[in-house]
């Protein structure tokens, strides 16, 4: 039995799609030195190669892929988008605007200089910025721009070609810039990170390990009574000195939860909760006493929960003002927009921030009720909310504005992005509404993007040979310029106009480029995770601006003549 693989793939779009995805994902795992190709470029390269052999795919799959991707981008950005946009993110908003705006202007200028069409120009912008939201926004706007037939087909093919030719150079050049640009400016990044650490009282241990608190019990003997010297627990300040917290006391056979006015007495059995190293810092009077193995005293359900910040008495306040330790709770992590932040007492909390807190289940629940709600650990997605907001996004995308002879449609990309932002924002404010597990959201977003990349690659592959010979070297030069020049402009603006701390500035610049590998290099150079504060500040807003840039470049292009 002979099987013609080419006929089999041509006759089955679904099989072809998953073959492209599988081969592309394998290719994406390859590394060039320290740089991994990545899933997007792997799938795009494989689809371009198969497209040259005249394989094609149904465009409906391509459209669904980009819709799912851009909607999920909005859902991720939603919890923090409005707080950054309206309140404490002026510098971050301005940096993201400068980065994206300068790249857009430079790309338009180079496109006109080299005589390209809008497809190549928009694709070059998307690839140079390593930004699939630009590609998605531009592709959707092209389909609603009034182009038809072969003109639209050529523009879409050139869009994916420009992206493919410049993506890798955009990624590599940004990583090189992240490695060497901090060394070319006069302020040492590590010194800048230490400076802001001193100002804000940050933990300078960037590799801090997170342990679950443990509970141990001791009997109060003469040494401990003498050490306490009649002071109550508040005056002793055991937590301030060691990091341990007295959770329970058994006195005369009766279990009680002590308050700050309690005084240790001879024969008391006390249960202390704290991290292992905190127990090691206890006064010898504790350790020299008799350790007690009292099942009831030690029977405490230590839990670790993720608390979403929501309530007005927590939003806008500094982390230290929550006084978690006064309530017997221990903070493990602070997460903003899926990015782990330094545990900084002076970090101002935004609505939607996630605090990972450990402690007695009852105490953690009390703290959660005070500042927000415990994140649902269900693995069930609220598909009704997902579908409803997806429909709303599509309906918003159908809106068209007419100005004399010029009409402008919102488009699916902008509509779905806005609907996703609203779903994410509402989820951050209402714990039982619109829940989507992060793993499910990541899977849908990644799958949608890969389907979209496979579609554009197969569509563009047939003409890549001719186009590459005509514009190849121009694309590489333009890609390098659009990748690096906005970074330099953004640095000068942030350093000399906004006068930002350099560690925060470089983190914010990488966030404006939504490039995690470059962010890791900045953190390594600074030997600190302080740049993550800046990265989180610009990341959410940049994703939105990059999508709009893809739309704007298509709208602006005809007016440039």
UniProtKB/Swiss-Prot annotation:
Write out the GO biological process terms: potassium ion transport
Instruction: Tell me which SUPFAM superfamilies the record gives.
Output: TrkA C-terminal domain-like
Which Pfam families has this protein been placed in? Answer: Asp-Al_Ex (PF06826), TrkA_C (PF02080)
Q: Where are the transmembrane segments?
A: 8-28, 32-52, 66-86, 94-114, 158-178, 383-403, 406-426, 447-467, 475-495, 540-560
Which HAMAP family does the record associate with it? YbjL
| PANTHER family registered for this protein in UniProt | K(+)_H(+) ANTIPORTER SUBUNIT KHTT, TRANSPORT PROTEIN YBJL-RELATED
Q: Tell me which family the UniProt entry assigns to this protein.
A: Belongs to the AAE transporter (TC 2.A.81) family. YbjL subfamily.
Q: What is this protein called?
A: Putative transport protein Ent638_1362
**Natural source organism:** Enterobacter sp. (strain 638)
